Amino acid sequence: MLRVGGLTPLSATDWPGMLAAVVFCQGCPWRCGYCHNPDLIPARGDSEIPWDEVLAFLRRRQGMLDGVVFSGGEPTLQTSLPDAMREVRALGFKIGLHTGGAYPQHLAAVLPLVDWVGFDVKAPLADYPRITGAAGSGERAFAGLQKILASGVAHEIRTTVHPALLSDADVEEMAHDLAARGVQHSVIQAFRSQGCGDETLRRNAARDRPLQETGRELTGLFETFSVRA
């Protein structure tokens, strides 16, 4: 049974262009300092929502929502995710997924069930452990990215930018690398202090240069590119 740490009944931002409910899956193997859902990191949460209650809610929303996004945490950590997606799809909803690619093989298993993926690329490959606190996380993430690109599933590739963690040079390096790998839809988004448990990151989030200026230099690399500041 899927472990659910939270549920947003309606969102117009978690899946661009869609009205969706968001199911927050409990558990994540990474420890990103800027995480705005730190309560979802442990494998078990203090206030989990029974999966049957989530399904009951979704039945009441049939015909009112376009889709359901499985977010986290890291949804692909849970081996029950494919069955949960099938149950939601059987109710007539489209399926979205937020993931960092921590489990490439699990990701590959659910891609045939998914209509759209929001995939987080956190750093240049070699610098991943500095962000995630996990050795080998970069290799896992980029293996997951390649599976998404090969699948043909609609997606956007997103990078959260905090000036203490990623320099403009890092962002530019990442953009060129992603374009070379075949990424066509890219977003860079500013760090959000809400929910972040790292006081140092919250205090030192000011940028010397607006993120939009960095973004203007990268627009031509992708079919679609945007900055969420």
Please state what every model-predicted region is.
Residues M1-F24, R31-A43, R60-R61, E223-S226:
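N-terminal [4Fe-4S]-dependent radical SAM core
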Residues L7, Q189-F191, V227-A229:
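Conserved beta-strand termini and adjacent loop/short-helix elements that scaffold enzyme active sites
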Residues F24, S71-G72:
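A secondary-structure boundary/capping signal
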Residues C28-R31, E87:
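Short, charged/polar surface micro-motifs in flexible loops or helix N-caps
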Residues P38-V68:
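Conserved alpha-helical substructure of the radical SAM core
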Residues S47-W51, A134-G138, N204-L211:
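Flexible, glycine- and charge-enriched loops at secondary-structure boundaries
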Residues L55-R60, M64-G67, T76-R203:
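Conserved AdoMet/S-adenosylmethionine-binding subsite of the radical SAM
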Residues G195-A229:
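Short acidic, glycine/proline-enriched helix-loop-strand junctions
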